[in-house]
Amino acid sequence: MSIIELKGVTKEYGQGHTLVQALKPTDFQLEAGQFVAIIGPSGSGKTTFLTLLGHLQTPSKGQILLHGKDTSQLKEKERAALRFNDFGFILQASNLIPFLKIEDQFQLIDRLSKKERTNLDSLIELLDLKGTLKQYPKELSGGERQRAAIARALYNSPDIILADEPTASLD
């Protein structure tokens, strides 16, 4: 069984005559352990595709199955739980919580997650973040913020990691 599957998924923005199809009907399957790169020119729908995969948006049409279950009828609270437990997001602009110190970003995951997590000390060492833990995101360089965002995305041991230009701002 696929970890995630899209069946005839489309995404449209606007209304009436100003309707823009950002993603044409798309079928896609991702199996456990599989790595996939989505490439294409600017404006081709790559980010829209990733936000649909990660349940950050709902499709205009089609079905998204996660672990074989249709997620199209989930309420926002259930979708948020899916995002937290099943996905790690690494976005072009770091998605760290601005009012939490870096160490608190990880402690928040500790409090909210019931999953076994990746060893934080290993991530901190691997991504050279030891000196950043007591700082707020705004106090870090762009590269430090991006490395902290990568560590946070990996820390909850997600089934699926979605990265949209993850090397942006890395030093």
Regions of interest found by a model, annotated:
Residues 18-20, 71-88:
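ABC ATPase NBD coupling module
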Residues 54:
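Helix-to-loop junction immediately C-terminal to a conserved catalytic motif
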Residues 62-70:
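Conserved ABC transporter NBD signature motif
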Residues 70, 115-132:
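Conserved ABC ATPase "signature" region
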Residues 84, 135-138, 155-156:
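Conserved signature/switch motifs of ABC ATPase nucleotide-binding domains
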Residues 100-107:
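Short coil-to-helix segment of the ABC ATPase nucleotide-binding domain corresponding to the Q-loop/switch region
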Residues 136-140, 144-146:
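Conserved ABC ATPase signature
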Residues 161-164:
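Catalytic Walker B motif of ABC-type/P-loop ATPase nucleotide-binding domains
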